[in-house]
A protein has these predicted regions:
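A conserved regulatory-domain signal marking ACT and ACT-like small-molecule sensing domains
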Residues: 2-99
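Gly-rich Lys/Arg/Thr-decorated short loops/hinges at beta-loop-alpha junctions or inter-strand turns
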Residues: 16, 175-190, 211, 285-291, ...
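Gly/Ser/Thr-rich loops at beta-strand to alpha-helix junctions
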Residues: 25-29, 51-56, 71-72, 166, ...
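Short acidic, glycine/serine/threonine-rich loops at helix termini
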Residues: 79, 132, 170-174, 227-231, ...
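Extended, charged alpha/beta regions that create polyanion-binding interfaces
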Residues: 82-179
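Glycine-rich phosphate/diphosphate-binding loops that line cofactor/substrate pockets in enzymes
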Residues: 200-215, 310-313, 347-352
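Active-site histidine-anchored catalytic micro-motif
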Residues: 215, 233-236, 240-286, 357
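C-terminal functional extensions of proteins
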Residues: 267-316, 323-354, 358-422
Length: 422
């Protein structure tokens, strides 16, 4: 089939082999082609020993593939690679556990996680690994297993080592022509028709909210600079947003606009820099610090509009993470990166099912690294390199929309505001 049950004659030197199998909607979700491409890219060879293709849309397919490599090291490397997308060695056996040697250190051969749903076979029991996240270890405690960041491991905790007994579930494309977000993981392009994609996102948000799920927005200061802050305020006041993740810049420029009508000293109504406008952002930070923080400024009537005002008055939880380039920062900004990660993980694990990244490359990549693969993730930026980087850094499930953030928010609000779609 295609490249044949056998791509080429097995090399005389290729004496190391392993049989893997993969199940599910492996053809239309591009899982099997990706596995075969990975094998070829690694200069290994394959033989498809068995292939069963589902006859209807609801039927899963099955493939059993023998991988042959010239060395044991090459075989281990390619098997580990194809496991990341759902291929499993036949007879995986029991997972091996070793204690962490000290705080903040995994065993040397620890299993490094993906953001896909994963199970581990421990003592004859199959344990689902909670809180899927890339680049973590797997902690086993009693009858439970969960992803554990390196910074949180403590001496003596039992950590999965090697790949034996670990099963990764491939992320499959939704079934049927009406499936919401069947376009996930599509390539980035500024020429794609966006109206249908935004309509599908609005439908996904409605469904998630009706089922009690949470919607997360990760936003950069460009939302304010482009005059789109009021659009985000409308999303918040409409009850569509549950969490806001940002740095120091977004709230600073939002508050600068609320107090002075400028962002980075430029009037958002006239588009012109004002005299001494370059001082406004620092004066805004100082005023909020004087009032004791954002929440206090809202209670005292000092802050009466804007994104942060809307968050405070509509109960939207926010996490503000600082950086070394921040002025101030604002009192609510957390300057400990480990605490920031923990705060964001806590919100994500509380039921986030949709994440929308708005014009912030570094923050989007950071949050994307924390998200499970099943979270619907949309990255919006005018720069195609930004949305490409998010996928390249591991958040492969993300959809990139190359467009102005204001246009995106306006179209999304229009779709969410249609009475017949409520």
């Amino acid at each position: 089939m295609g490249r044949g049950a056998r791509l080429s004659e097995l090399s005389a030197k290729a004496i190391h082999s392993q049989v893997v199998e993969v199940r599910g909607h492996i053809i239309d979700s591009q899982i099997l082609p990706r596995i075969l491409d990975d094998i070829l890219d690694s200069e290994c060879e394959f033989v498809i020993e068995e292939m069963r293709v589902g006859r209807t849309r609801g039927d899963p397919s099955y493939a059993r593939v023998e991988i042959t490599a010239p060395t044991a090291e090459a075989l281990n490397e390619i098997v580990a690679r194809v496991r990341q997308v759902g291929a499993q060695p036949v007879q995986t056996g029991q997972a091996k556990l070793e204690p962490a040697p000290t705080d903040g250190v995994f065993p040397l051969d620890f299993y490094s996680t993906t953001n896909l749903q994963t199970t581990v076979n421990v003592g004859g029991r199959t344990l689902a690994v909670a809180n899927p996240e890339m680049d973590c270890g797997v902690l086993v405690e009693g009858n439970s297993a969960r992803c554990l960041p390196l910074s949180e491991v403590r001496k003596g905790q039992m950590i999965v080592v090697g790949h034996q007994g670990v099963t990764v579930m491939p992320l499959e494309r939704p079934r049927g022509p009406s499936s919401t977000f069947a376009f996930m993981s599509s390539s980035v392009s500024s020429e794609k028709p966006r109206a249908g994609l935004i309509h599908d996102l609005a439908r996904e948000i409605r469904q998630v909210k009706s089922e009690g799920g949470k919607v997360l927005v990760v936003a950069g200061p460009a939302v304010v600079h482009t005059g789109s802050g009021e659009l985000l305020v409308r999303l918040i006041s409409g009850g569509w947003i549950d969490y806001l993740f940002a740095g120091n810049a977004l709230p600073t420029h939002d508050i600068e606009w609320a107090l002075y009508g400028t962002a980075l000293g430029v009037s958002l109504t006239e588009g012109l820099p004002l005299e001494r406008g370059h001082e406004h952002h620092l004066r805004a930070i100082n005023r909020i610090r004087h009032e004791g923080g954002i929440a206090s400024a809202v209670r005292k009537g000092v802050l009466t509009k804007g994104i942060m005002y809307a968050c405070e008055t509509h109960g939207v939880d926010y996490v503000l993470c600082g950086s070394i380039r921040d002025d101030g920062p604002l009192p609510e900004v957390c300057t400990d990166v480990i605490e920031c990660q923990q705060a964001m993980r806590q919100r994500i694990h509380s039921g986030v099912r949709v994440a929308i990244m708005l014009s912030t490359m570094l923050h989007s990549i950071a949050v994307g690294n924390l998200l499970p693969a099943h979270v619907t993730t949309v990255c919006v930026d005018i720069n195609p390199a930004v949305v490409t980087k998010l996928a390249d850094r591991g958040t492969f499930q993300s959809l990139g929309l190359v467009m102005d953030v204001g246009s995106f928010l306006r179209e999304l609000l229009d779709d969410l505001g249609r009475p017949q779609d409520r």
